[in-house]
Structures are given as structure tokens and as C-alpha cells.
Regions:
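N-terminal Lys/Arg-rich, disordered targeting/topogenic segments
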Residues: 1-3
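A domain-start/cap signature at the N-terminus of enzymes
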Residues: 6-77, 89-90, 101, 131-134, ...
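Short substrate-entry loop that stabilizes the transition state in hydrolases
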Residues: 71-117, 200-201
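Glycine-rich nucleophile elbow surrounding the catalytic serine of serine-hydrolase chemistry
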Residues: 82, 169-178
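Surface-exposed patches in mature extracellular/periplasmic domains of secreted proteins
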Residues: 111-112, 158-166
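Cap/lid segment of the alpha/beta-hydrolase catalytic domain
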Residues: 112-140
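Conserved acidic catalytic loop of the alpha/beta-hydrolase fold
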Residues: 143-162
Length: 214
């Protein structure tokens, strides 16, 4: 096996090729389903696909929604954050009955990834850092994607909502807890983090994601 010097390190040529291809797949090539036209939400179960970031269309995200028949913009909005399995639609279905009874607009973003079992930085860690360890701009944080989705709900439906609630289970619980810590300007009214496997402690001496240090 051929060994080469790369950034001062002795690594195999195969390792370099894998790293380059991984970088291209994760951060250069377009990812996600095709965007759907902007339109108002349908009553009942629905979904749409939008750009995850405001400054580029490179990454898209599917958003599942459930709008009760009697819901009005004066009622509650609840973001439901899925677990490690990235199965947002299942979480939406589990909440739909109570949402109908309580007049809650459900919003379940789907942070899809083929590598969800080995990559955690993009979702439950908020995408503050890339898989390769460098810091991402706040505009590409997963927490910012939630705010972008909330903006899309307002503009596409002529709503004038100014706050939302958010619940997360398992990996979604990690997401919610870290979002509260790292994005305090988010328009969150109430947040519930359930069954999180790990937490970020308010300790700058501990590097993120287990603390808030760099």
C-alpha cells in the first residue's frame, strides 16, 4: 500500500481518496430531495421540501406537517424532533391524534442521512462543526434550519407567528437541549428535551458537544 505525506501526516493513498470523496459528498455535491413549490399547508398530513440554508440551495430538507382542521394562527405550533433513526414521519404520525384534539400545528423536520449511525455532528450536535472538525458558520447550523423553516411557514401561509414550541426525543432531545444553549435568540416559547443520550454542560472548559467550550 502506497504511503504519502498529507498535511504532514503519513497516510495511505486510499485513506486520502476516501477523505476527499467524503468531503465532496458531504459538503460540495447537492444533497437532499428536490425542492417543492411554495404553497400553503394542506389540512391534515402534508410535507414540503425547502432549502435548508438561506444562502445556498446545495442542501434541502423535507418537512412533515400536520394541520388540524380547526387550527388557526392563534393556536400553538410544535416542532417535533426525531431520534437517531431520522424517521420524522413516524414521529408526526404518533403526535397527530393529540394535535387534532388540542389544535396544535405539528412540524417535523427530517434531517435525513445515509450515515446516521456513525455521523452525529450534522443533527444532534447541531452541525456547529463539520465531520472533519472545523467550525461551520451559524447560517449552516441545524438549529438555524429550524428558524428558517419557521420563516417559511410564515411566508408561505401568510401567518404572523412569533414563537413556537419544540420537543425532541433521544437524539432529538440532544438537539433541543443544545439548541437552547447555543442559539438563545431562537423564537422558542417552550422546549422539552426527552431521553437525551448525552447533554452539553454549561462548562467552557469542556469542548462542545459535551460542554460549551471550543
Amino acid at each position: 500500500m502506497k504511503i504519502i505525506k498529507w498535511f504532514g501526516l503519513s497516510v495511505s493513498l486510499l485513506t486520502v481518496i476516501i477523505l476527499i470523496l467524503g468531503y465532496l459528498y458531504l459538503y460540495v455535491l447537492p444533497t437532499g430531495p428536490e425542492k417543492t413549490p411554495v404553497r400553503p399547508l394542506s389540512v391534515g398530513k402534508d410535507s414540503f421540501v425547502m432549502s435548508a440554508y438561506q444562502h445556498t440551495d446545495r442542501k434541502t430538507i423535507r418537512v412533515w406537517t400536520y394541520k388540524p382542521a380547526q387550527w388557526t394562527p392563534k393556536d400553538s405550533v410544535l416542532f417535533v424532533m426525531h431520534g437517531m433513526g431520522r424517521n420524522a414521519e413516524d414521529y408526526l404520525d404518533a403526535w397527530s391524534d393529540i394535535a387534532e384534539r388540542k389544535r396544535i400545528l405539528l412540524v417535523a423536520p427530517e434531517f435525513a442521512s445515509q450515515f446516521y449511525r456513525v455521523i452525529t455532528n450534522d443533527y444532534q450536535e447541531g452541525n456547529l462543526k463539520s465531520f472533519f472538525g472545523w467550525s461551520n458558520p451559524e447560517s449552516e447550523w441545524a438549529f438555524t434550519v429550524i428558524e428558517n423553516i419557521f420563516d417559511r411557514l410564515n411566508t408561505a401561509n401568510d401567518f404572523d407567528l412569533d414563537e413556537y414550541n419544540i420537543f425532541g426525543h433521544s437524539a432529538g432531545g440532544q438537539f433541543v437541549q443544545r439548541m437552547i444553549l447555543m442559539k438563545p435568540n431562537a423564537r422558542i416559547k417552550t422546549a422539552i428535551a426527552g431521553n437525551a443520550g448525552t447533554y452539553s454542560f454549561v462548562d467552557k472548559a469542556v469542548p462542545y458537544p459535551y460542554g460549551i467550550g471550543t
